[in-house]
């Protein structure tokens, strides 16, 4: 398990223990080290800035990220993003994907990013919904807020196949209240980055499928307010209270502990443009290291 630090180590002993190892063999030291030094500055400045997107990060992620961005590691990378409901993880994920796609379009990079949606791996329970008479009646006796409600082993297998360069047919779960899962629904091609987000994306059965683990954190009062705004939009009525209480209770058991598995903890409350701005700084390193003769207009 990774132990998430909140940026500044309190003792020299801790600093020595958590200091990332530098193992650069085939790539010139100067190149990887230069990227790592730039990343340290980028992370440091962002963390210290007002309204930062960063709550904390494991120092070892700097070294690992440097190897990917410098080209020392050229294989595809997988990113897992987790957080409670209404934490902002879906919005952040979409912004990451949009930023990567914009860069890929500018530099004519094919197969830049593939999204694997965690929610699509809920088990098909359509027969149970029909037997109950409605989804709301079904949900009274079936808990969707636990990782056991999803086929995470299948999701892990699909991600690993994509990372090995194999195309995979992904499932599609109907979120409209039928609890139908359509298997082999969407063809996903392998790409340079595989990204997934969901409540249980960093839980035990799936976390090892990801090279980079991100947790999106948010204050409870903000998360609760967002939840009930969304509940009103979905016309959940009085049932929203029970749904929220169950989701919060199960998050305490299954979701919040994932924060301590994460390489990076992001704030789900930062100004949206700042996530893209931070990512563009990382992309700037990729541009300099791999596209030195091509400038973004």
What role is predicted for each listed range?
Residues 151-208, 255:
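Glycine-rich phosphate-binding loop used to anchor ATP phosphates in small-molecule kinases
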Residues 2-75, 208, 228-232, 249-297:
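NTP-dependent small-molecule kinase module
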């Amino acid at each position: 398990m990774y132990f998430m630090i909140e940026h500044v180590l309190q003792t020299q002993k801790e600093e020595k223990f958590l200091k990332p190892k530098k193992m650069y063999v085939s790539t010139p030291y100067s190149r990887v080290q230069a990227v790592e030094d730039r990343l340290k500055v980028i992370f440091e400045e962002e963390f210290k800035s007002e309204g930062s997107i960063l709550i904390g990060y494991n120092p070892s992620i700097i070294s690992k990220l440097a190897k990917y961005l410098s080209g020392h590691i050229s294989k595809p990378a997988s990113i897992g993003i987790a957080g409670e409901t209404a934490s902002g993880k879906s919005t952040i994920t979409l912004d990451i994907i949009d930023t990567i796609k914009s860069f890929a379009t500018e530099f004519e990079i094919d197969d830049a990013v593939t999204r694997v949606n965690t929610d699509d791996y809920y088990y098909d329970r359509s027969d149970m919904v029909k037997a109950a008479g409605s989804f709301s009646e079904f949900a009274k006796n079936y808990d969707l807020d636990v990782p056991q409600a999803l086929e995470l082993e299948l999701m892990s297998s699909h991600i690993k196949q994509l990372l090995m360069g194999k195309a995979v047919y992904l499932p599609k779960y109907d979120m409209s209240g039928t609890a139908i899962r359509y298997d082999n629904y969407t063809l996903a091609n392998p790409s340079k980055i595989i990204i997934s987000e969901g409540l249980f994306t960093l839980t035990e059965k799936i976390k090892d499928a990801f090279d980079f683990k991100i947790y999106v954190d948010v204050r409870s009062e903000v998360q609760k307010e967002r939840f009930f705004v969304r509940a009103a939009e979905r016309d959940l009525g009085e049932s929203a209270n029970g749904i929220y209480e169950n989701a919060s209770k199960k998050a305490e058991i299954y979701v919040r502990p994932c924060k301590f598995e994460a390489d990076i903890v992001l704030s789900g409350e930062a100004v949206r443009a700042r996530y893209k701005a931070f990512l563009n700084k990382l992309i700037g390193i990729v541009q300099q290291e791999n596209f030195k003769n091509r400038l973004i207009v």
